[in-house]
Amino acid sequence: MKKVTMNLPEIKDYRLTEGLNQLKTNLAFCGKDIKVITMTSSVPNEGKSSVSFDLSKTMAEGGKKILMVDADLRKSVLAAKYHIQGIDKGLSHYLTGQAEIEDIIYETETEGFYLTVAGPLSPDPTSLLDSEQFQKFIDKVRDDYDYVIIDAPPLGVVIDAVIIGKYCDGAVLVIEQG
């Protein structure tokens, strides 16, 4: 498995740390069958990608094996935001038959934290996410990880998060503070 490097900013706000710990605990209380979680928001720029990333990292630091999947195939910000280096294939490569599952999962510098990025923009992201190939991906990673955190597009913009949600065990709606 390939390893990526990235800029991992330290979480300095105790309120964010406490919120992530509460979310992590609440997910654990949902039961062992709740493993694949969609993270979305109602509109862009509410912080869902940051919460998805920070939650995944926090859970991994707590001893869980976590896969974070960037499924925002239209407007992904993850790779650029965290300056991720060493990635050559993403989810869209797998969904279009250009890569195998093992080619799109990367180990991070945090033990237990694995990552799949969105990959290049596709002409029809909705069809890719509503495909048998995406179902196969979810079925495979569900068995291999303690939790799969899927960063989905905002609900109020495109239908993709609803489609992704049908393959998941639960959803978290992130809203901007204030």
Specify the residue positions occupied by each region the protein language model found.
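Conserved Switch II/interswitch segment of TRAFAC-class P-loop GTPases
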Residues: 152-157, 168-178
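Hydrophobic anchor at the start of a short beta-strand
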Residues: 66, 148, 171
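Alpha-helix C-terminal capping segments
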Residues: 58-62, 163-167
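Primarily NTPase-proximal linker/entry elements flanking Walker-type ATP/GTP-binding cores
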Residues: 30-36, 57, 61
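Conserved beta-strand segments of the P-loop GTPase G domain that flank and frequently precede/overlap
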Residues: 38-40, 117-118, 150-151, 173-176
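Active-site signature of alpha/beta-hydrolase-fold catalytic machinery across serine-
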Residues: 54, 58, 81
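Hydrophobic positions on the alpha1 helix immediately C-terminal to the Walker A/P-loop
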Residues: 50-51, 55, 160
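P-loop/Walker-type NTP enzyme "switch/lid" segment
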Residues: 2-17, 21, 25-26, 30-32, ...
